[in-house]
């Protein structure tokens, strides 16, 4: 069985004062507060959201 690749994403800057579309991407990734870390599957949709708000995030790739 092949394991899905995961990405560990941490919100390092505040979502307040950002564009509504950027806030929606942050919420779509499951991030609710500063310095919260979540693991998301490495899919094109998640990669797109991460790329859009990459200036607010710290990303660690996992195997």
Curated annotation (Swiss-Prot):
<keyword id="KW-0689">Ribosomal protein</keyword>
<dbReference type="Pfam" id="PF00327">
    <property type="entry name" value="Ribosomal_L30"/>
</dbReference>
<dbReference type="GO" id="GO:0003735">
    <property type="term" value="F:structural constituent of ribosome"/>
</dbReference>
<dbReference type="GO" id="GO:0006412">
    <property type="term" value="P:translation"/>
</dbReference>
<dbReference type="InterPro" id="IPR005996">
    <property type="entry name" value="Ribosomal_uL30_bac-type"/>
</dbReference>
<dbReference type="GO" id="GO:0022625">
    <property type="term" value="C:cytosolic large ribosomal subunit"/>
</dbReference>
<comment type="similarity">
    <text>Belongs to the universal ribosomal protein uL30 family.</text>
</comment>
<keyword id="KW-0687">Ribonucleoprotein</keyword>
<comment type="subunit">
    <text>Part of the 50S ribosomal subunit.</text>
</comment>
<dbReference type="InterPro" id="IPR016082">
    <property type="entry name" value="Ribosomal_uL30_ferredoxin-like"/>
</dbReference>
<dbReference type="InterPro" id="IPR036919">
    <property type="entry name" value="Ribo_uL30_ferredoxin-like_sf"/>
</dbReference>
<protein>
    <recommendedName>
        <fullName>Large ribosomal subunit protein uL30</fullName>
    </recommendedName>
</protein>
